[in-house]
């Protein structure tokens, strides 16, 4: 127990030494960064770093809070601030800050602010962070802890010497000890020790006030406003942290936040040379400056300085001309490099008092400092697009020539609208500003200009049309045969009829369907994507319509049907059947919209009287007259139908019958004509038996000598029952029409 208590006391002593020596390194006037002379220099040697029992009497009384830690009470964070003391300045002094590009920014007048905070150190014993709580509980080694603290102190001393405040102090000492030359370029151009660097110790648990001083969080250079760096700090600040040392009571941490810019200058405004230079700069001002603290300057001060400037104007001008001739080339090259593109327009820094800016740089600044007007199209040019509030045309405006813009930029602004006159009544819009922001001509703009070129330039469009017509004339293969939907193409129908008449009996119905599909005009094939209905997509046949197809009844197996019904040869019977089907379709316009080849097919078994009437007709005209009549009727009937359905598709069957009489569901979307031999086809074939009986009765009444042939027909139908199940539509048609 005694050993543990001794170890705990040693650890507490090391914690007290940590707070005291860290504060001493930052605040002591004998630290290495203040070694301007050899007197009263306190050596931070190895003995001082290793001796943790020494108490420093130079520290203020506030440090006593952190000098006697017992391990039970909570230690607040200790804050040490390093600041630039301005209390010795009077109202005639002006404090300015130079940024990294050499531009001067006005900070304040001598009596406006008392301090400018440069650094803020945070020294704390952290016993609540997750890092400390997650640390393993090992036995504390006092010797190891002492070595770690010595390493921390040495690192802290090195860090202090590298901070910007040390450089400011060294230059301040040089300006004190050096010759007081008003024309010199020293950062501190004061006649005495008017400013100094000081430190103060604060309690981190209490709020830190910035009244009467420029706090660390306030950016002097306004280009840093609303900007953060990688460490989530304001852009004008930087931060350094030292690796913490672990103890059983908490982590010993040290961190610092400091200003990046430290090159301050102090000028006396009552100085004659400064007044002359300040007046010359004010005459050649390049925009608003960051001078918020100079608003209290009265007109009397200006009136006092102005006569002085007029009395010494001539000798000062001679001196200025000599300086300008010597430095003109150097100033031009330097300032052209120092002008940043990202520089703030409304908060530009003040120009250095002992330098003159060339006229070329001044001329460049005028268009830059001009405030941007978002409601003007011509942001690149000097004029707006139009001053007329009405919807005036852009072509009435004089063209604004821009060397980097495309010459067709004016017409391009109206591309998205319907017409040129449909633009907004305002002189511009945000869309036009967006297009004006691009200086280079892109590929899209070139394509759009080509597209707009033809309606805007009729001569070139006519030339393009002439070239296109010549191209068509030179290549006759490119001629387009265009036919309207209402007027079907003039196709030689007689050739098709002759082809059907000369078909050999050995050909089956599939070859006929293929011949129909091959004879289709490709110009009248419809695309399925053009249909807007939700019904099953039928197979579309050509817009012109042929007569009744030569079905199996015209072939060798069923040739007796034509003889029995027509009473003549097979060719004349086929012509009569086609003629009858055409007459029937012309009289029944109220039927379903099927072509003449299906004329009355779905309702053929409801018209037995008409069948007998047509069966009693004979061949009364010559073949030529019949062909002419057939062609005329087909030409007239073809115009009444726009499309037909393939004779073998399920859609043709379902569309021809009344839906209430069909005992099966409607077929779904079939992409091609199909023949499905399912049970429903047998039901559809039942009317064929009645048709055969009707045909036998008509033959027995009119043609008794052909009775045996009718029996043969029935025998043939029974033999070909399987085929009739598939191709029953053709049998029904011809048995009805014969």
UniProtKB/Swiss-Prot annotation:
GO terms for biological process: autophagosome assembly; autophagy; autophagy of mitochondrion; cellular response to nitrogen starvation; Cvt vesicle assembly; cytoplasm to vacuole targeting by the Cvt pathway; macroautophagy; mitophagy. Induction: Translation is induced by nitrogen starvation. Translational repression during nutrient-rich conditions is dependent on a uORF (upstream open reading frame) present in the 5'-UTR of the mRNA; it promotes ribosome dissociation. Translational induction occurs in conditions reducing translation machinery efficiency, leading to ribosomes scanning over the uORF (leaky-scanning), and increased translation of the mRNA. It is found in: Cytoplasm; Preautophagosomal structure. Changing residue 438 to A: Leads to constitutive activation of autophagy. Present with 149 molecules/cell in log phase SD medium. Residues 279-359, 377-462, 521-599, 690-719 are annotated as: Disordered. Belongs to the ATG13 family. Fungi subfamily. The gene is ATG13. Changing residue 348 to A: Leads to constitutive activation of autophagy. The extended 70 Angstroms-longloop of ATG13 specifically binds the highly conserved innergroove formed by the armadillo repeats of VAC8. It comes from Saccharomyces cerevisiae (strain ATCC 204508 / S288c) (Baker's yeast). Changing residue 646 to A: Leads to constitutive activation of autophagy. One of its GO terms (cellular component) is cytosol. Residues 345-359, 534-558, 570-579 have a biased composition (Polar residues). The keyword Protein transport applies. One of its GO terms (molecular function) is protein kinase regulator activity. This is Autophagy-related protein 13. Activates the ATG1 kinase in a nutritional condition dependent manner through the TOR pathway, leading to autophagy. Required for autophosphorylation of ATG1 at 'Thr-226' and its dimerization. May also be involved in the regulation of autophagy through SNF1. Involved in ATG9 and ATG23 cycling through the pre-autophagosomal structure. Also involved in cytoplasm to vacuole transport (Cvt) and more specifically in Cvt vesicle formation. Seems to play a role in the switching machinery regulating the conversion between the Cvt pathway and autophagy. Keywords: Autophagy, Cytoplasm, Phosphoprotein, Protein transport, Transport. Changing residue 581 to A: Decreases phosphorylation by PKA. The modification Phosphoserine is found at residues 344, 348, 355, 437-438, 461, 496, 535, 541, 554, 581, 646, 649. Hypophosphorylated form interacts with ATG1 to form the ATG1-ATG13 kinase complex. The ATG1-ATG13 complex interacts with the ATG17-ATG29-ATG31 complex through direct interaction with ATG17. The ATG17-ATG29-ATG31 and ATG1-ATG13 supercomplex interacts with the PP2C phosphatases PTC2 and PTC3; to regulate induction of autophagy. Interacts with VAC8 and forms heterotetramers of two VAC8 and two ATG13.
